[in-house]
Swiss-Prot record:
HAMAP family found in the cross-reference section: Ycf4
Gene Ontology biological-process entries: photosynthesis
Membrane topology: Multi-pass membrane protein
Cellular component, GO, one term: photosystem I
Assigned protein family: Belongs to the Ycf4 family.
Compartments in which it is found: Plastid, Chloroplast thylakoid membrane
Transmembrane feature ranges: 22-42, 57-77
UniProt main location, coarse: plastid
Record keywords: Chloroplast, Membrane, Photosynthesis, Plastid, Thylakoid, Transmembrane, Transmembrane helix
Task performed by this protein: Seems to be required for the assembly of the photosystem I complex.
Protein name: Photosystem I assembly protein Ycf4
Length: 184
């Protein structure tokens, strides 16, 4: 989503609160909980899950391994739920032609550097760069080339934009910033 006026362009960036992350977190939580319950039921020799009789699983070595996988999956699932709740990666890109400043803001993990803010002068922007990698895992990424600082990505690597969409976005941004476009 973006908002534009004559002098300001604000591009909102979606973070980790995506449907795919929710689905993976739920699937991982339920699967690892199932593994852990089967491992515990093999240790207790009771059926904690009625669909699967615990007598078929010996605690050593299958029950221990399933318990370990269940715990590992719960840790990974809790990590996913934390990134979703903190909305890591979300933020905005603000281009202000009137003041000549570009602000790139992202939310990070809690701690000292939770808020990530880059402030740049528009005069330091060399170009808008499109990087295209075709093949099995094709990706198209939009970068802003800065003098002395390298390239700053403006789109996510998992954002699957069509060639037409990325070209249009690059052309509009380059026109707004009055800089050239480079394609790699």
């Amino acid at each position: 989503m973006s908002w534009r006026s004559e002098h300001i362009w604000i591009e909102l960036i979606a973070g980790s609160r995506k449907i795919s992350n929710f689905c993976w977190a739920i699937i991982l939580f339920l699967g690892s909980l199932g593994f852990l319950l089967i491992g515990i039921s093999s240790y207790l020799d009771r059926n904690l899950i009625s669909l699967f009789p615990s007598q078929q699983i010996l605690f050593f070595p299958q029950g221990i391994v399933m318990s370990f996988y269940g715990l590992a999956g719960l840790f990974i699932s809790s990590y996913l739920w934390c990134t979703i709740s903190w909305n890591v990666g979300s933020g905005y890109d603000r281009f202000d032609r009137k003041e000549g400043i570009v602000c790139i803001f992202r939310w990070g993990f809690p701690g000292k550097n939770r808020r990530i803010l880059l402030r740049l002068f528009m005069k330091d922007i060399q170009s808008i760069r499109i990087e295209v990698k075709e093949g099995f895992y094709a990706r198209r990424v939009l970068y802003m080339e800065i003098r002395g600082q390298g390239a700053i990505p403006l789109t996510r690597t998992d954002e699957n934009l069509t060639p037409r969409e990325i070209e249009q976005k690059a052309a509009e941004l380059a026109y707004f910033l009055r800089v050239p476009i480079e394609v790699f």
